[in-house]
Amino acid sequence: MSQLNPKVGFVSLGCPKALVDSERILTQLRVEGYDIVPSYDAADVVVVNTCGFIDSAVTESLDAIGEAMNANGKVIVTGCLGKRPEQIREAYPQVLAVSGPQDYQSVMEAVHAALPPRHDPFVDLVPDYGIKLTPRHYAYLKISEGCNHRCSFCIIPSMRGDLASRPVDEVLREAERLVRGGVKELLVVSQDTSAYGVDLKYAERPWRDRMYQTRMKALCEGLSELGVWTRLHYVYPYPHVDDVIPLMAEGKLLPYLDIPFQHASPRILKLMKRPGAVEKTLERVQRWKAMCPEITVRSTFIVGFPGETDAEFEALLEFLDQAQLDRVGAFAYSPVEGASANALPDPVPEELKQERLARFMARQAEISAARLEAKIGSVQQCLVDLIEDDIAVARSRADAPEIDGLVHIQNGGELKLKVGDLVDVEITDSDEHDLFGDALPSDPAAQPPRALNLQMV
């Protein structure tokens, strides 16, 4: 690579949707001939993609901007916190430019102004699947931007706007390019995966030799043609979520749902502006498990929402006992600038919020440990993420990267497993988070690899 190429440092913060934004910016930078460098010292300019969802994320973003300013001095800010430019410029008036999320054009214009490109088409080769910040064997596939819901604790619509779905053929072509580039797991992300296509009136689009609706189920049917793991994230609990469970039971889609329930009190859910039919939610969870016994259900909850009573918190614990969810994340409620929930009466004292959060997580830890223990003796298909000495660290079909558990394959070194390998593992032990086991030697004659159904585009 020519030493004359301008060099850009990049800091990516926030959720997987923001990570996809970062990947798109990085891809465009490389297409235009910029080198991406890993240190502030080596960079001619630094781009910081921020998060601004909760107070801790705002603090982290401001700290990252400050670190880049101190170490480099030439900083371009983008992302969700960029929707509050006055807050950024008050803290760091010397930043070169500020733009909001998915405003790729503004970022590139700011980079051009600070550092004109020197594109060499004979040297600067970028794969057709773009620049990825994830390991090569998995990738996030963003299907839409924004959200039509107005949950009282959330400010995402004010940052990312209303729902804007990508046409289904565009998404499927991107997925095909990713798989052709070596991806073995597609993680479908958006602000509201269940609502995919409603803004486009579920328009039909051609892909390969058939028509697909711009709708969650049709998208999943198309993705199943690629022969890789496909995992659904951020699924809002609409009734039509039931439609994708048969695809999971048939092995066309990973039996995994990331579906945020947020609470179990009808009154609190109403204050949150979330669906409040808790009994129906429990019925649906049980129905999913009956239709697809392998299904893993992950959810997130908010503890200590304004007005939450002792009885309502106890109802939340009872919901955990009844639902028997596999994976759960939770956080204590904290006010978010711009959220309507800030105006609600009867805030829960901070000490009580933390006490409830600890009780909540302890209860779920018992449930998770029991559900993992039940897998001892079973054989789980796993995807290897990391090799540490003689142990291969992998994930089962029930585990999304970074947020769920791991499978520690004790004989990974002996079998010379590699990152990205798919392997069957006999589970021998467990704890409240992870599984432990031994990989079974592959038998190519008995289990031929599934061919990837790829077409050139």
Swiss-Prot record:
SMART domains: Elp3. The keyword RNA-binding does not apply. Residues 6-116 form the MTTase N-terminal domain. It is found in: Cytoplasm. Residues 373-441 form the TRAM domain. Pfam families: Radical_SAM (PF04055), TRAM_2 (PF18693), UPF0004 (PF00919). Catalyzes the methylthiolation of an aspartic acid residue of ribosomal protein uS12. This is Ribosomal protein uS12 methylthiotransferase RimO. It comes from Xanthomonas campestris pv. campestris (strain ATCC 33913 / DSM 3586 / NCPPB 528 / LMG 568 / P 25). The gene is rimO.
